[in-house]
From Swiss-Prot:
Residues 1-159 form the Obg domain. Changing G166V: No increase in persister cells upon overexpression. The gene is obg. Monomer. Residues 160-334 form the OBG-type G domain. Its EC number is 3.6.5.-. Transmembrane segments: none annotated. Keywords: Cytoplasm, GTP-binding, Hydrolase, Magnesium, Metal-binding, Nucleotide-binding. This is GTPase Obg. Mg(2+) binds at S173, T193. One of its GO terms (cellular component) is cytoplasm. One of its GO terms (biological process) is ribosome biogenesis. Residues 385-399 have a biased composition (Acidic residues).
Length: 406
């Protein structure tokens, strides 16, 4: 199944049925009077969050959806049948945006939640409606109203409690394998992870949280380089971010430099996202045998970042330190939930932060889309470099194929 997290579709609700002009005509009833019925309402279009879906790939191939038109009115005061509503299933976590105004129509965050995106047309009136004491044989009717038509943009953001940040090969997928039953692909080359992966982490007998891994970020990601920038939006709804740093990289690069790249690119993508609760997780420390060297590398990263938050030293491969980290995450999430219920000011501050993150992420991605459109139309700036992989339509046949649908 191909992972598609953005699509554009056109929806058209059903038109209302026309009212009928008709008169009662029976033997021995010379002037039976009007009996034209009303038309039926047009069908509306709804989006429904379906917990069994995790991609918008179905809407990549079919992009126009029309609801059924209401039937016209009939004689003998018969009302036309209402057009059937059209229900379009989408994954939980889908944001619906009006493509013309960029207005957010709604957010589908709960299984079974429905959102009307196109209102069916109102029915027309038959001539019976216009009968009066002075007009006993009206010849007036009204047509049905046209159904609402809209161009929509659907954006999927996975719903997770914890988001993982890091360069390619920082050990994010290995971490998910260590703490959950998820089995994302793991290898010793960059960009092994091509789509977001989710894992459910069980803590104790009855508690759990969801962790999301996205493709790694690289230098220049905020300008569209690599794969990770497109998927950073999936971290917008997380409650806490884990910044994983490879402390023993194969190319012997400085871990402090790698950590600094992530913080810088995160800030360029969304300054508000840097205000989200974030913990520093130093991975692969088991590969550094000298305790003094281990401590020196740890302090170098902390000092370079000016870090004052929580720091964890783990080995995802050996599962060393992962259990304690998972328990602390669960404890933080429980305390956060309790505080949200008891402190309205804290809840409002988090809601405002969420809004800022959503707005900044959408603005950044829209800017990248606009720049890509300019390049494709031959107006590429002299200094611009089209180094992202999302307009690559060739299938190399190796691994999953990724589609970005503008």
């Amino acid at each position: 199944m191909k992972f598609v997290d953005e699509v554009s579709i056109h929806v058209k609700a059903g038109d209302g049925g026309n009212g009928l002009m008709s008169f009662r005509r029976e033997k021995f009833i010379e002037k039976g009077g009007p009996n034209g019925g009303d038309g039926g309402d047009g069908g509306s279009i709804y989006l429904e969050a379906d917990v069994n879906l995790n991609t918008l790939v179905d809407y990549r191939y079919t992009r126009r959806f029309d609801a059924q038109r209401g039937e016209n009115g009939g004689s003998k005061d018969c009302t036309g049948a209402k057009g059937d509503d059209l229900i379009l299933p989408v994954p939980v976590g889908t944001t619906v945006i009006d493509a013309n105004t960029q207005e957010i129509i709604g957010d589908l965050t709960e299984p079974g939640q429905r959102l009307m995106v196109a209102q069916g047309g109102w029915h027309g009136l038959g001539n019976t409606r216009f009968k009066s004491s002075t007009n006993r044989a009206p010849r007036q009717t009204t047509p049905g109203k046209p159904g609402e038509a809209r161009d929509l943009k659907l954006e999927l953001k996975v719903l997770a409690d914890v988001g993982l940040l890091g360069l390619p090969n920082a050990g994010k997928s290995t971490f998910i394998r260590a703490v959950s039953a998820a089995k994302p692909k793991v290898a010793d080359y960059p960009f092994t992870t091509l789509v977001p992966n989710l894992g459910v982490v069980s803590v104790g007998r009855y508690k759990s949280f969801v962790v999301a891994d996205i493709p790694g970020l690289i230098e220049g990601a905020a300008e569209g380089a690599g794969l990770g920038i497109r998927f950073l939006k999936h971290l917008a709804r997380t409650r806490i971010l884990l910044h994983l740093v490879d402390m023993a990289p194969l190319d012997e690069s400085d871990p402090a430099d790698a950590a600094e790249v992530i913080v810088r690119e995160l800030g360029r993508f969304s300054p508000a996202l840097t205000e989200r609760e974030r913990w520093l997780v130093l991975n692969k420390m088991d590969q550094i045998l000298d305790p003094a060297e281990r401590e020196a590398r740890k302090q170098a990263v902390i000092e370079r970042l000016g870090w004052e938050g929580p720091v964890y030293v783990i080995s995802a491969l050996e599962r060393d330190g992962t259990e304690a980290l998972s328990q602390d995450i669960m404890r933080y999430l429980d305390e956060r939930t309790l505080r949200l219920e008891e402190d309205p000011q804290y809840a409002e501050e988090l809601a405002e932060l969420d809004r800022r993150i959503e707005d900044e992420a959408r603005a950044r991605l829209q800017a990248l889309d606009d720049a890509r459109a300019l390049r494709r139309s031959g107006l590429k700036n002299a200094g611009a470099v089209d180094d992202d992989d999302f307009d690559d339509e060739e299938d190399d046949g190796d691994g999953p194929e990724i589609f970005y649908v503008p």
